[in-house]
């Protein structure tokens, strides 16, 4: 149930009846403060201006046409023309009953779309590092949310699996007589990469051989293709371990590397030339875009093929967007790539639109994100100034969480302790990131993320176990509760119920904007409201069975909402902490 959508429809009809245009926006929002009701319609200002009347006068006329019987207990005009809506307790009670009767907690399903989500995108022959964390976990939270809403989601792991470095790596492996690359661990490959690069820079004969190997690889030579495939396989096997540790839904089947688009590139360059979009300039093939200017104020040239015939990332990204529309039949494409790539993507997509490869009706959305910073406000590094490997970060998270939970649970079995430490440690790293607005940089701080107070994973996981403990203490049969009515008579009951019923609205925002922090803020709010409700509205010692059962049902919906909400974020819940 989307109460915001229901009220928007009702207010919109009343506005039209009061003389507003048919496309008027009621601007129904969740109220920021309790005294302004549960919802507020703010659309009178803009519409009244068009109609040449005072907003308050329009609001008064709208109220004469607004029928919210059975939904609102009170509707009032505030300030210059805001309409405050207070929900009817009986309506809240009925919606809570319906949410509990549904596995989906009453969340409706929008029109099903095919949505391609591009995220994670590590490089072959390199271990994943902290720079891959944000794309991987924010993208996965978006995927989980979209899938829960019923969309057909195609995960696209745009792996960097092509380029001159492969000639270099294969040449170096050969030189070291390590052709059986399948037996190597990725840590070896990292060392090989460094050594190969050093030789490539210092040994011209080696560099020449590496360049020849690239040509052979690109021409489809069987031996070189096999060596390349081994490098890719080793990398993705290692990355899968990281994905599984992170509780991320990516698998090998989701890999759509840069190499996938190679066969398309010559045709795209030829087509862009034929369409008059690409021209020869100083030996290269270039698309000049009026939408982007260089320092001199002239249209910026975007190279799609170099003098030597090589292609660029832009060419691949043009092919990639085309493929996602034509072959994957995407209705919408989301890219979780850091903000530094924004202009590059905008240029590629401008060419895509001009060439007619993807119609304007199919959104291409760059859901960019900021950087992960250390406490000093600089990019997060090791003490020695190197890049932090993702596996090392997760190891440290697990170790810190292990100490934390062992201290709080001295009698817990080793197995249970390990499971709990894993849920808390990995959850803490993910939640610390997901709870921040993705568009901003954020400070990585172990102490904050592992705290049991504030908007953190440990606090949210504990809040969930606290609700469950109510049922454990009372030894209640949840099935027997099903027929008991919900009675909303206290303000704290109403506030908790109203917020719980905004779960669908929250999911809708996350799905539309790709902003998991909105879900984190919502769940944190729910946990806080439950805490106040638990303190002031006795559950197990309620004055009678009817009130006790009703409050148990509110607790039940709280637990289900917290669990499902955390699941859309990829955060594991535990039964006890």
Swiss-Prot record:
Subcellular location: Cytoplasm
Top-level taxon of origin: Bacteria
Record SUPFAM superfamilies: Anticodon-binding domain of a subclass of class I aminoacyl-tRNA synthetases, Arginyl-tRNA synthetase (ArgRS), N-terminal 'additional' domain, Nucleotidylyl transferase
Predominant location: cytoplasm
One annotated Gene Ontology cellular component of this protein: cytoplasm
MF-aspect GO terms: arginine-tRNA ligase activity; ATP binding
EC number assigned by the record: 6.1.1.19
Motif residue range(s): 'HIGH' region: 122-132
Keywords: Aminoacyl-tRNA synthetase, ATP-binding, Cytoplasm, Ligase, Nucleotide-binding, Protein biosynthesis
GO process terms (BP): arginyl-tRNA aminoacylation
Catalysed conversion reaction: tRNA(Arg) + L-arginine + ATP = L-arginyl-tRNA(Arg) + AMP + diphosphate
Family to which the UniProt record says this protein belongs: Belongs to the class-I aminoacyl-tRNA synthetase family.
Subunit structure: Monomer.
NCBIfam families: argS (TIGR00456)
Protein name listed in UniProt: Arginine--tRNA ligase
């Amino acid at each position: 149930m989307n109460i915001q959508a229901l009220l928007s429809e009702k207010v919109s009809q009343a506005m039209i009846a009061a003389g507003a245009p048919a496309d008027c926006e009621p601007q129904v929002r969740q109220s920021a403060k309790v005294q302004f009701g549960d919802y507020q319609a703010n659309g009178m200002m803009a519409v009244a201006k068009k109609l040449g009347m005072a907003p308050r006068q329009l609001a008064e006329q709208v109220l004469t046409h607004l029928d919210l019987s059975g939904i609102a207990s009170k509707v009032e005009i505030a300030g210059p023309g805001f309409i405050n809506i207070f929900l009817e307790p009986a309506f809240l009670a009925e919606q809570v009953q319906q949410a509990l009767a549904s596995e989906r907690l009453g969340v409706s399903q929008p029109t099903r779309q095919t949505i391609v989500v591009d995220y994670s995108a590590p490089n072959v022959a390199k271990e994943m590092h902290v720079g891959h964390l944000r794309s991987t976990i924010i993208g996965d939270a978006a995927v989980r949310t979209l899938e829960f809403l019923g969309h057909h989601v195609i995960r696209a792991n745009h792996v960097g699996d092509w380029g001159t470095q492969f000639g270099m790596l294969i040449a170096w492996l050969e030189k070291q007589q390590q052709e059986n690359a399948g037996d190597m661990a990725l840590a070896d490959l990292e060392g090989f990469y460094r050594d190969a690069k050093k030789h490539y820079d210092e040994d011209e004969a080696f560099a020449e051989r590496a360049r020849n190997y690239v040509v052979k690889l690109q021409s489809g030579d069987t031996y070189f293709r096999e060596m390349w495939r081994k490098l890719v396989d080793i990398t993705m096997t290692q990355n899968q371990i990281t994905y599984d540790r992170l509780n991320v839904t990516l698998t090998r089947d989701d890999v759509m590397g840069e190499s996938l688009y190679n066969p398309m590139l010559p045709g795209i360059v030829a087509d862009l030339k034929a369409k008059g979009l690409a021209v020869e300039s100083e030996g290269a093939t270039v698309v000049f875009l009026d939408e982007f200017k260089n320092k001199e104020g002239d249209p910026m040239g975007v190279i799609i093929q170099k003098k030597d015939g090589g292609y660029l990332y832009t060419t691949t990204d043009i092919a990639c967007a085309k493929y996602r529309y034509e072959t994957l039949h995407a209705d919408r494409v989301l890219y979780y790539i850091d903000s530094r790539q924004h202009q590059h993507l905008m240029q590629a997509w401008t060419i895509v639109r001009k060439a007619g490869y993807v119609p304007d009706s199919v959104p291409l959305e760059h859901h960019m994100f900021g950087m992960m910073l250390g406490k000093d406000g600089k990019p997060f590094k090791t003490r020695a100034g190197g890049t932090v490997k993702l596996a090392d970060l997760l190891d440290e998270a697990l170790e810190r969480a292990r100490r934390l939970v062992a201290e709080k649970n001295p009698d817990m079995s080793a197995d249970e302790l390990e499971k709990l430490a894993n849920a808390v440690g990995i959850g803490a790293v993910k939640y610390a990131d997901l709870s921040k607005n993705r568009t901003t940089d954020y400070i990585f701080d172990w102490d904050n993320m592992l705290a049991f107070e504030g908007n953190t994973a440990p606090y949210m996981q504990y809040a969930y176990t606290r609700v469950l403990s109510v049922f454990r203490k009372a030894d209640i049969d949840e099935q027997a509760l099903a027929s008991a009515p919900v009675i909303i008579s206290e303000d704290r009951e109403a506030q908790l119920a109203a917020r719980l019923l905004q779960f669908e609205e929250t999911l809708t925002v996350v799905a539309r904007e790709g902003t998991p922090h909105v879900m984190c803020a919502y769940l944190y709010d729910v946990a806080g409201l439950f805490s106040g409700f638990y303190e002031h509205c006795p559950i197990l010692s309620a004055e009678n069975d009817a009130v006790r059962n009703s409050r148990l049902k509110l607790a039940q919906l709280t637990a289900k909402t917290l669990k499902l909400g955390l699941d859309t974020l990829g955060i594991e819940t535990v039964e006890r902490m």
